[in-house]
């Protein structure tokens, strides 16, 4: 099933998406490269009454051999990119590698992500488990209303 340039595949093994390489299959996997792709995947799941899980690098993920009865979303492409915007800011997609973000920040002279150098996860995963918080500008925490992250 193709939705807005992103692909939703059904009956996808999840073991290859985890660091320990075990687990069953998901009913569906959406590899999303854009915010619109995520929106479309969520709509697709809601239309089917399916639960949703977002998966990053799979470094903190154990999947049951029974699999996941729902839609798994992976953030790829632009949603896993990293861009240094100025001397004080860097944009990271939720699917961006946390160690890679640390490297890019250090190369740009930015500080604050050093703790993540050895964490094999994603920026989105670090936000989810509250290891980091987004900031809008130097010294201010970022609070983004729905749809503002476009």
Q: Model regions: which residues?
A:
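Anion-binding (especially nucleotide phosphate/pyrophosphate-binding) glycine-rich loop
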Residues: 1-123
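FAD-binding subdomain of flavoenzyme oxidoreductases
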Residues: 111-118, 122-150
């Amino acid at each position: 099933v193709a939705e807005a340039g992103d692909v939703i595949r059904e009956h996808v093994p999840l073991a290859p998406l985890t660091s320990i390489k075990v687990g069953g299959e998901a009913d569906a996997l959406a590899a999303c490269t854009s915010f619109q792709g995520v929106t479309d995947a969520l709509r697709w799941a809601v239309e089917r009454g399916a639960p949703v899980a977002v998966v990053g690098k799979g470094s903190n993920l154990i999947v049951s051999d029974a699999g996941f009865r729902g839609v798994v979303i992976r953030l790829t492409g632009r949603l896993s990119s990293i861009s240094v915007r100025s001397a004080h800011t860097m944009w990271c997609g939720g699917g961006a590698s946390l160690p890679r973000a640390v490297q890019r920040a250090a190369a740009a002279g930015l500080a604050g992500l050093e703790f993540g150098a050895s964490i094999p996860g994603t920026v989105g995963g670090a936000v989810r488990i509250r290891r980091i918080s987004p900031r809008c500008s130097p010294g201010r925490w970022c609070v983004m209303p729905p749809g503002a992250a476009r």
